[in-house]
Structure formats: structure tokens, C-alpha cells
Amino acid sequence: GSTVNHQYSKSFQFEKDFHEFSRMFLPGSAYYFSMLRPLSEFQIAGYFSSCKAYHDIFRSCNVGSKADSWCGHCPKCLFVAAILSPFLSQEELRKIWGKNLFEDESLLEILEQLTGIQEEKPFECVGSRSEVNTALYLTVSRLEREGIPLPALLACYRTTPQFEEAKKSGDVFSDYFDEENLVPEPWKALVRCRCAGEEARKRIC
């Protein structure tokens, strides 16, 4: 049989294949690489949280794509809200979606799929469950520290084994840096400096 990957064009395998193709058949062409390859989605979300000018215009919702909007009801919407939540206030999240998705109890099943409470994962381009759990743990911890009542979905998540496991692990993604990449120097050093380690931790509210 043949390996099928509808996300092949986003993979490191494609990046390597096209890089080699360019070297062999397109001499003198651009050096092809992904500057985001070394980073986790958690770190990318953290960096993007500081790009305030784009918060009103970015989209990552398949359902609302034709209307250039967020539907506010799908796994993509809830994942993006979750991965951004350690870095933005609840009011900032509300402004992006027009509501606080964590207050929408109809999204509980999707939250359970994103965090691994349910075995089935959404058939959408969403990040890893470990990243979602880390993000939600940090968000719950911050809200409790600030004395802010947990919205319905986070209150439910607070009672789960997934929360307890994330609590034990803590923030395991701020220091992440995947050395399997084609990022050349000095760009690699720049990515590490701006998006990993202490700079990444500073963005957590």
C-alpha cells in the first residue's frame, strides 16, 4: 500500500524533499525552510499572543472560512482558544470570538476530545493533547490565583485526571526546541531567542 498524508505539505518530510529537489533541479533558487519547524504550537501561540495587531483579523476556522469568521462551535475554534488561553486574558479571548468559548457547555464533548478524556480525537488540524492540557492547566491555575471563577468548561476540566497529570508535569513546552529542522543560522538563534526558554515563559500571564 501507499502512505497517505493529507498534511504532507506541512510536514518536515515535505520540507526535506522539496529542499533536496530545489538543490538538484533549481540551482540558485531560494533556500526553502520553515522558520517555525523547531517550535511547538504552544510556543507559536505564545509568540502570536504578543502580535496584538493581528488578533482581530486572523482566522483558523474551517466552518467559518467562507464568511471570514470564527464559527465558535468547532474543534478548531476551541483548540485555538485553548492554546492561546495561557497568554491572553479571558476578555481578550472573548473579543476574538465574540464570546467566551469556555462558558459554552455545548463544547464540553469537544473539550474532552481535545484533552484525551474521550479516546476519539477531532478530525481537524489541532495540536497535541499534551499541549492542550498544558495550556488549560496554566489557564486554570492563573484564574484560581487571581480569584476569578472558572467558566463552565474549565471548571469541569479542573476535576479530571488530565488536569492532575498536567499539574504534575508543569510547563514542558516553553523550553522545547526541535533540532530536526533546516533553519539556517543566524535565523535559528533568533527563533530560539525570541520564542523559546525564558522569553516564552514571560508571555504566560
Model-flagged regions — what are they?
Residues 1-205:
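Nucleotide-activated chemistry modules centered on ATP-dependent adenylation/adenylyltransferase
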